């Protein structure tokens, strides 16, 4: 009842505001000789809208067209009065559309080949910025340009630089940290090309973005986003995946007044919807399932509301995803390579680490484990030693690895294992597929997988109340997902999976409905997506990071080391070995 009352009040304020701001829904925008249109959507900005436009006119005069879009403000401020003498096209949305839709609308209405998107609280400082932007886009219009920000605040009506903001930023990037929202972006602190006036950046941020109308339409703009949130991540990834580039203009400095509070509702089902949509459209299958699972774990009620909205237009999103796959020349994996190249903070820390991986390898080889499984047994040691060998090209332990595997294989043949993932058949099977997928073993593994399948066929998954990855349904689904993917890619049928697909699907849905464990949720969603949508050719091979918690600590005293895969010594050194290989490839360390 309270929410309904608030909606009525909001609608009333919107009607009053529209009466006070008699703009146009579809104004007739006349072509000019200008090359650039500035587009400013806003909501409840007060005097700042007019001051932003004044700053534009004071620096470049009438060299740009300006479209100002009032997204159904409710503050009663007389915007039209401020804007009337400033030669702008002023539009009032009769219903709130949100930032993304308002930006796309403004671009659609513009008559110039290029445009600049701004917020309604910005300042300009020189008279060359328009010509500079136009020249860069004329030279190459497969670009999204980002202005350099000056961080401002407004205190008692006075606009000033934020004194505490002493560091510079150079665009943004996506950390892509499991357990966090994968579409989240953060400021990038390192400068990639200090000697240049421009430099490529992974993601634009700061609310000053320029592009060509032709290219924006080819990318389908911000299509699908609701109200507020994630514009920058969405459009930046699309630019890089299409084959274009995001570029920071260090010479074009634009002041941005950072507000204490957003006028748009934050952390709503609509914002979660945007995160679901972007991940589904642009991420490979395994990663969008991680994003869905993370949002489900974080706030299940809000996730279910967002998911319902998403599923209402599922056919539209499938078609849009297919459009991107047809028209983009790069993949999400290529985008992450761009990030690693441009963001030294991703990899430079590993330069400074002094991890005795040779010593750890010797330690592991000398510490046999009684258990045979993946988490704290021999299979985990085999995986670590194979990763070490693959990264370091040190083949000292080749015979030792074979001997370890012979012991595990013998135990599998003698049916001495539980079915679970942590210390049983599911984990051993997953480990075998991992080694084969990453070309760390040459032997055919079909016999071992078929044997594991036959033993797992006796497991009553639908009766198991344990939904966890380690010892329950989540772990069986982890193996089933890897097994099905391996079978599809290598044209090898997985009869246990095919014969029990309905039962496994029901088990996966039970995990989604009842579990709060991230890894279990991820594999439940991955299994359902794989069965429903098929294998994604752009997906990653299975990896330890799919389920292993990343740690960054190794005891200095070797007496405190352990040879268990899931303990800090091996998880940290595994991360180091993987990134050491990437650092070498990017020329960062030798």
Kindly label every feature range from the protein language model.
Residues 1-17, 48, 205-206, 267-346:
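Terminal low-complexity segments of carbohydrate-biosynthetic enzymes
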Residues 1-55:
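N-proximal low-complexity "stem/linker" segments adjacent to membrane-targeting elements
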Residues 115:
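Short aromatic/hydrophobic "clamp" motif used to bind/position activated sugar donors
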Residues 78, 94-109:
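Glycine-rich, basic loop-to-helix element that forms the pyrophosphate-binding segment
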Residues 100, 182-210, 269-270:
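A recurrent flexible, glycine/aromatic-enriched loop bordering the glycosyltransferase active site
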Residues 70-79, 123:
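A conserved acidic beta->alpha catalytic loop
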Residues 54-63:
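Short, acidic, metal-binding catalytic loop of nucleotide-sugar glycosyltransferases
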